């Protein structure tokens, strides 16, 4: 059984070049992480896989790349200026600051109850804190300030002067850049409902208590789709995207027992939402939200219509029906899902003779390296390099000629490389190489000319 503690995952991520602490030579900056050579490949592969299925292969959806900085009126319209808050509480004893909802949920979970605090009033939170004997996670005391709201948006200034007239925000989500461009995209691409607009981009939230490695950070990347449909068809499309998102994860190798779908109860739903479902992943630290699929009705388009004066009424070219489209929003965190795939892939396997190996069982489509070329001897490096150079034109391939072949296999297993290609002394004569499979460790001999197509076949999902 693999020891899937966060300490183990973080140690491997740092050691093997997946993720490094941000600004490490200056003592770091709390809650910032830099993706290393393998981490950036893994994350980019996941983003490419999302774009492939949600945009490239979709008959409905197109993409956009909206600016991070928006007219601040957009954030007033969306409700973020007035309502984008988390409940904050301070410990009077040690001065630590916490998200009230999270310490309540953690205290309840410690006593065997899984509760949802979202939707509770401050008074209800206080009562729940008493019920579960909530104490400060840092010092163990139960001496707290009153709960209050904390706005999560980062403020900055545009231009050379710092005044309220120049105040702007780093976007806390990518979605609003899609909504304000609804008419631009619909007209320019001649789209008819149902259709969607997808975007991948950075967002920023001044989280009260970030943590759990890359799970909750103040700077993060989102992969969001806003899917517009006719009112009355929204719940059907919500069900469709819920299953589509789940199957995307499964097709990329995520284990079904590592995830669960949780439909929000009525008292959890936003006032404008008809339905919301979270896809949660079982991280080593517990269940955490991975993907939110929300039926946002026509709330966002109506808000921007009201505040901008722009008419987002859609006119059906066949029926002449006029309506404000409803919107289904599957919103996925790129950093969270990258961490989830890393945790899910991690395994420790016992082998014969008290030997064991650490292996990352990534689907080949998202593995950082698709293959590694390993010359059996350094005397064969020139010929093996030619094979490596040819394969690199098609996909990322590693090259390793140091230490024994067994140790090189173990290194590639530990970074999730699905195939190792061994070039031996017979290869010069027969033009064949040995291909080793990461998961089964089985080997097969094949012509060098067939290796590229063989690997590409396994990249499909």
UniProtKB/Swiss-Prot annotation:
Q: Which CDD domains match?
A: GlyRS-like_core, GlyRS_anticodon
Q: Which Gene3D superfamilies match?
A: Anticodon-binding domain, Bira Bifunctional Protein, Domain 2
Asked whether the UniProt record includes ATP-binding among its keywords, one would answer yes
Q: Which residues bind ATP?
A: 205-207, 215-220, 289-290, 333-336
Highest taxon, organism lineage = Bacteria
Q: What is its main location?
A: cytoplasm
Cite the EC number. 6.1.1.14
State the reactions this protein catalyses: tRNA(Gly) + glycine + ATP = glycyl-tRNA(Gly) + AMP + diphosphate
Q: Which GO terms describe its molecular function?
A: ATP binding; catalytic activity, acting on a protein; glycine-tRNA ligase activity; protein dimerization activity; transferase activity
Record family assignment? Belongs to the class-II aminoacyl-tRNA synthetase family.
Q: What functional role does this protein have?
A: Catalyzes the attachment of glycine to tRNA(Gly).
Subunit structure, per the record? Answer: Homodimer.
Protein name in UniProt: Glycine--tRNA ligase
**Classification lineage:** Bacteria, Bacillati, Bacillota, Bacilli, Bacillales
